[in-house]
Amino acid sequence: MQTSRISSFFRGLVHLYRWAISPFLGAPCRFFPTCSEYALVALKKHPLRKSLFLIAKRLLKCGPWCIGGIDLVPRTSVEEYLSSPTPLAESPDDRTVPHTQETS
């Protein structure tokens, strides 16, 4: 499918950024999740066009004029990020939703 190839291309660009550019920038991201993880999760959870819109919107917020904070991809929760053994952006199966422990 053409869309999945394009989505894979954009995921590859994000991984390239993480590997080749991000280590040299120094300052940590102001947001949780980081902008690169946000991009990977958006590409995983939403259609390509919506993902690109969400990523662009997030990157426009990234700068010294913004305080930062928690800014999750729509249709995700903090619990999903915190309970996942691997980052949501890296999980092998899109259908896998991390479970949360229930207290009795």
From Swiss-Prot:
Coiled coil: none annotated. It is found in: Cell inner membrane. It is a peripheral membrane protein. One of its GO terms (cellular component) is plasma membrane. PANTHER family: MEMBRANE PROTEIN INSERTION EFFICIENCY FACTOR-RELATED. InterPro entries: Membr_insert_effic_factor_YidD (IPR002696). HAMAP family: UPF0161_YidD. Residues 83-104 are annotated as: Disordered. Keywords: Cell inner membrane, Cell membrane, Membrane. Could be involved in insertion of integral membrane proteins into the membrane. This is Putative membrane protein insertion efficiency factor. It comes from Chlamydia trachomatis serovar D (strain ATCC VR-885 / DSM 19411 / UW-3/Cx). It comes from the Bacteria. Belongs to the UPF0161 family.
